[in-house]
Amino acid sequence: MTFLQNPHFRPGPATGHPMLDQHAARGAAELLAQVFDHPPTPLVSLREVAARCGVGAVHIKDEGARLGLKSFKSLGGAYAVIRLLLREASRQLGREVSVTELPRPASGSLALPAAGTHDLPAHPDVARVAQGMTFACATDGNHGQSVAAGARLVGARAVIFVHSAVTPQRRQAIARFGAEMRLVEGSYDDAVAESARQSAAQGWTLLSDTAWPGYTEVPTWVMQGYTAMVHEIAQQLDAPPTHVFLHAGVGGFAAAVATCLHSVYAPGPKVVIVEPRQAACLLASALAGARTKIPDGPPTLMAMLECYEPSLVAWDLLQPLATAFMAVDDADAVTAMKALALPQADAEVVVAGESGSAGTAGLLKACADPAIRAALGLDDSARVLLVNTESATDAARYEAALGHSAEAITRRRAGASAAGLLSKQSPA
């Protein structure tokens, strides 16, 4: 494990962003609610983890059930598809197009409805615009699912670029939405570059979740979609968090959630960014004092976080806002997966994938080190917030790491829910 107190830490008004504040979060949540009839994801009180860590409270926002895609990414890519279609349809039709003119899935889920199966179909003019649009992106797995599912929902085409380390199960999870799959040799960053080249050449709409100079608007829309979960958290927590551990790949999720939390709970919690040791590009950037691309490293079990260059927008927000950066090992992620999946209390069971457990891994490692505990103020008054960003998106990998199937763990939690043990943690 590597730990770095951020030498550039300087929170204040300059660390905010108007597209990622509490007002933007409410707007994102309201837009999504007009398209999807979907309840908030649960906020689970982890009493055993809190006792193990010696802190006052630990809560985890469980995004594993978000819109049927098993990941928080369904808030970002699909949200940006909707925003981009609304803008393009308004431009082509010469009038402001409302979200009420978009299709509404009959199931309230991005995953379940067959193409064209909606409670409310799209306005014919808007549907024609959508049919002429192609959305393209690179992915480690989850963002591509969200873009592909969002494109299918509105009737557009999707082309998804995956690199060679994306597992067959994750590729199939994207392809089921009718997306055209393009394989790129190399890393996620190579897939990002190829998706940008092909989009420019083909006239496609590039929908990346990472930003670079000259390309920031769309990734910020993706990040704005993520803030909808903060809008929910603010209604679910009884007291403001003092600390939040957020894992990062390119940093878009971490920057969006941290920035929005600081808007909701000014002056906001201490923010600790957690990355895989093999792909700690944000930690390297903090050490260098500038956004830094690191060399491709060996693969990590935390595959959704295997990125080697921070998003420009994310880095600009996190550089002054993060209290500290951490890098954890694959074994730490497995320890966290087990802590979440196998507590003594059924009501605290959380199915967290290898990447979804990384923030929890950071908390467990920090609390086990007296010097880090002291540096972060992790004492019995601390109220820690975590986010499980994904459930078992690759069932075989999950079972191999944990020794238990995701289905078996889910059944245990379902039993607690049926017994009414989750009623206070999972608002309707």
Give the positions of each predicted feature.
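PLP-dependent amino-acid enzyme catalytic core
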Residues: 1-428
